[in-house]
Design a protein with these regions (language model features):
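Acidic, surface-exposed loops and disordered segments
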Residues: 1-148
């Protein structure tokens, strides 16, 4: 497994631009409705240029596995889960970004910008940076349902 860290805001801006161009094309062509029927709630934001994919995060880390790895999907998620916990402990905000994985799948430009070695595929994406908002307390969790 390898990690690709996007730490420069200029590079994140490149990812955003390519992704927004792709999203705009999909919105105009109505293809987005086929891939993601519940997209209606994001359409206005996409049309207004709001960053619905990367959430204005300044940084991103992509975990990639060799295409022939035995646990190619699970291992990256486990690794980034540890990083997620560590970053949260340092008061750095995180956001899992499954939409970016789809964007990488559909866009050769994004894959080229990602610059993964041949034979590797992005399997998990974690956005991170200092949070734009602060909460006085955590949200109350729902009761856990236990089945006997």
């Amino acid at each position: 497994m390898i990690f690709r860290i996007v730490e420069k805001t200029e590079e994140m801006a490149q990812f955003r631009k390519i992704t927004m161009d792709l999203l705009s094309l999909l919105v105009r062509s109505k293809l987005l409705h086929i891939f993601y029927p519940s997209i209606k709630r994001f359409l206005e934001d996409i049309r207004n240029g709001k960053d619905v994919i990367y959430r204005d995060a300044p940084h991103m880390i992509v975990a990639a596995s060799p295409k022939n790895a035995p646990c190619k999907k699970a291992d990256p998620w486990i690794a980034l889960s540890y990083l997620d916990t560590y970053l949260q402990s340092m008061k750095i905000g995180t956001c899992w970004c499954g939409f970016a994985l789809y964007a990488f799948l559909f866009s050769r430009k994004l894959r080229k910008l990602l610059a993964l070695p041949k034979g590797y595929k992005a399997e998990a994406v974690l956005l991170f940076g200092y949070p734009a908002v602060k909460y006085a307390r955590a949200a109350e969790p729902e009761d856990v349902k236990i089945i006997d």
